[in-house]
Regions:
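Residue-level detector of short, conserved catalytic/binding motifs and their immediate flanks
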Residues: 42-45, 95, 135
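Short N-terminal binding/cap micro-motifs at the start of the first secondary-structure element
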Residues: 1-5
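Acidic, metal-coordinating catalytic segment for phosphate/diphosphate chemistry
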Residues: 6-54, 63-67
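Conserved Nudix-box catalytic region and its N-terminal flanking loop in Nudix hydrolases
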Residues: 56-105
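Nudix hydrolase/Nudix homology domain
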Residues: 30, 73-87, 119-124, 129-186
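A short, structured loop/turn motif at beta-sheet edges
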Residues: 52, 108-111
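Short, well-ordered strand-loop elements centered on a beta-strand within folded domains, enriched
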Residues: 54-63, 145-152
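A short coil-to-beta-strand element that immediately follows conserved catalytic motifs
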Residues: 110-119
Length: 186
């Protein structure tokens, strides 16, 4: 099981299923949970990658001031995603429905892709980190045919992972954790 951690933990199917267990999961108004670390808001965090090995590139952007989470404005990021909502529960797999909805809202992806679940992300060093639990997904694109749909994803595009690693301090904590994990896989 996942247990108590901070940072990045490799994916474990049993822990993931426990998180999604209806006996443990509930929908609450964001106003009730945004400042309460006893509740963890589940966030699919999708990383778009093209290429392989040292030549691979990740989609990255700067969060604009109109994006939902004010505490992350002006931060650089490699993750696309957002909150699972009650509306996502209408589908057969609420987590996947939420992830696909967030991707469709924020990105235009016009190429084939494959998916790998990398792991869990939790950052207890900041107020925003203490109330969210991320599930990092690596989306391997066949070609770099992806662009931001949402106008609040600014200065976006694909960059070599080595460049992102060199400038990792400009990125939000979750992105730093994922860049470190992916850089170690070269």
């Amino acid at each position: 099981m996942l247990g108590n951690f901070s940072g990045f933990v490799p994916f474990d199917q049993q822990s993931f299923e426990a998180i999604l267990d209806p006996d443990h999961m509930q929908f609450r108004p964001r106003s009730q949970v945004e400042e309460d670390p006893s509740f963890k808001q589940l966030i699919p965090y999708c990383i778009l990658q093209v290429g392989s090995g040292p030549e691979r590139r990740l989609f990255q952007y700067t969060r604009g001031s109109g994006q939902g989470e004010k505490r992350l404005h002006a931060k650089r990021s490699i993750g696309i995603g957002g909150h699972i909502s009650r509306e996502d529960a209408a589908g057969p797999d609420l987590y996947r429905c939420g992830m696909q909805r967030e991707l469709a809202e924020e990105m235009v992806i016009e190429t084939e892709l494959s998916e790998q679940v990398l792991g869990f992300i939790y950052d207890d060093s900041s107020p925003v980190g203490r109330v969210h639990l991320g599930v990092a997904h690596l989306l391997q694109l066949a070609a770099p045919n992806a662009r931001a749909r949402e106008s609040e994803l600014i200065d976006s595009g694909f960059s070599p992972i080595s460049e992102l690693f060199t400038h990792r301090d400009h990125f939000e904590t979750w992105s730093q954790l994922c860049i470190d994990e992916l850089e170690g896989r070269c």
